[in-house]
Amino acid sequence: MDNMNHEELNDQLLVRREKLHNLREQGIDPFGKRFERTNSTTDLVSLYGEFSKEELEEKEITVSIAGRIMTKRGKGKAGFAHIQDLQGQVQIYVRKDTVGDEEYELFTTADLGDLVGIEGKVFKTNVGELSVKAIGFTLLTKSLRPLPDKYHGLKDVEQRYRQRYLDLITSMESRETFVTRSKIIREMRRYLDDNGYLEVETPMMHAIAGGASARPFTTHHNALDMELYMRIAIELHLKRLIVGGLEKVYEIGRVFRNEGVSTRHNPEFTMIELYEAYADYNDIMKLTENMVAHIAKKVLGTTTIQYGDYEINLEPEWTRLHMVDAIKQHSGADFWNPMSVEEARELAKEHNVEIKNTMEVGHIINEFFEQKVEDKLIQPTFIYGHPVEISPLAKKNDEDPRFTDRFELFIVAREHANAFTELNDPIDQKERFEAQLKEREQGNDEAHMMDDDYIEALEYGMPPTGGLGIGIDRLVMLLTNAPSIRDVLLFPAMRHKQD
């Protein structure tokens, strides 16, 4: 901000504080009391928008509304303003001979951004705009800072994220995004509740970081004098509940991963995980596509959505494709025949796939997928059959134990869900954890830790189980056509602002 703008802003702050002082001198509370509203702006339009000017004059409908002043004009003994609430804006008309000298002075000295209450009659102007003619004008909150320019709003994207409250004031689109987010989560809950799932709550601080391959945040519990991890997944506690006999469970909650920030990643994000006893990953595929289609229909009214340049069809059934077939289809590389690590590395070299020297065949297969296939998956596609090396908690496939009964859901080249037939063999699970420990020793700090307590739980017997995790933030991005995860998080993680 240059010196002139800085000085102008300071002048505006001073003027508003002078007005604050004057209000108090007059015995008026600038941060007022409860105001009872009869209607929102949307109510007025839906209830009275179709009435003619003459019908409204005849009916003399009195309403009470409240909101923030967004525009204001007029001189002398009358003026107009637009006030805004959550749903939208409505015009108000204030006349000195109707509200009286004191209240009219409140109106004339009010600034953009002030919160006011209006009691008045609904009418239409000569050009047909639905409005409220004030018979009472109440100042509810004095705004001490000017709003961003109403014609330009918040053009600085970073400022929108840092000062979300200003973004919500100035952008109806942003408000609608977060209302839609709430509806998406509500419909997700409703779908699962109606299908017999039980919502539960499990700890966010874990003694062992498990359930995913990710770097955790650490903290220290002073009273217990022990290191704890902010959870990187909800999985292992929910599967303990399956062992305990809660046959269909889910949790919607925050997960924390100490990793990079991007348009698709935030260190703190929201997931839903669910588990169903006596089911497998095929059942979970059906549940996933039906649930997402249900949410789209209920919230958006359609299963055909626009995301960027793509028209996406969410109507089931979605494409199902084995990871090895997807790689062969998009790169020509064939991993169906068993091969040594050396052969897999040579294949990677031939196809210009970057790999690390510590990678086993399964890791190399996954790199082929990520580098050659992932960005081609636009329409909803279940990729299944992940290598066992990268799926320590998934059950091996009966026909080819190199692979697992696991799937990931891809839409517009992004992973939206991860699911599998859960590994319920405690001996196999311990061996998988031991293999993960070796990876940690070789420098993979995202490899899974040993969890003896979870192994012990499995030893009591967990029924065959299907499990699912969906990143809610990415789902909201998809359904609101948002290009960045920061657009669907009210307060995304940001670097410290430089002075």
Swiss-Prot record:
The Gene Ontology biological process terms listed for this entry are: lysyl-tRNA aminoacylation
Pfam families from the xrefs? Answer: tRNA-synt_2, tRNA_anti-codon
Q: What class of enzyme is it?
A: ligase
Q: How is the cofactor bound?
A: Binds 3 Mg(2+) ions per subunit.
| GO CC aspect terms | cytosol
Positions of Mg(2+) 1 binding: 408, 415
GO molecular function per UniProt: ATP binding; catalytic activity, acting on a protein; lysine-tRNA ligase activity; magnesium ion binding; transferase activity; tRNA binding
**InterPro entries found in the cross-reference section:** Aa-tRNA-synt_II, aa-tRNA-synth_II, aa-tRNA-synth_II/BPL/LPL, Lys-tRNA-ligase_II, Lys-tRNA-ligase_II_bac/euk, Lys-tRNA-ligase_II_N, Lys-tRNA-synth_II_C, NA-bd_OB-fold
Q: What is its EC number?
A: 6.1.1.6
Kindly list the cofactors needed.
Answer: Mg(2+)
Q: Superkingdom, according to UniProt?
A: Bacteria
Q: Which PROSITE patterns match?
A: AA_TRNA_LIGASE_II
Query: Which reactions is this enzyme annotated as catalysing?
Result: tRNA(Lys) + L-lysine + ATP = L-lysyl-tRNA(Lys) + AMP + diphosphate
User: Which keywords label this protein?
Assistant: Aminoacyl-tRNA synthetase, ATP-binding, Cytoplasm, Ligase, Magnesium, Metal-binding, Nucleotide-binding, Protein biosynthesis
The positions annotated for binding Mg(2+) 2 are: 415
Q: Where in the cell is it found?
A: Cytoplasm
Give the protein family: Belongs to the class-II aminoacyl-tRNA synthetase family.
Q: What is said about its interaction partners and assembly? A: Homodimer.
Protein name, entry field: Lysine--tRNA ligase
Species in which this protein is naturally found: Bacillus mycoides (strain KBAB4)
Gene behind the chain: lysS
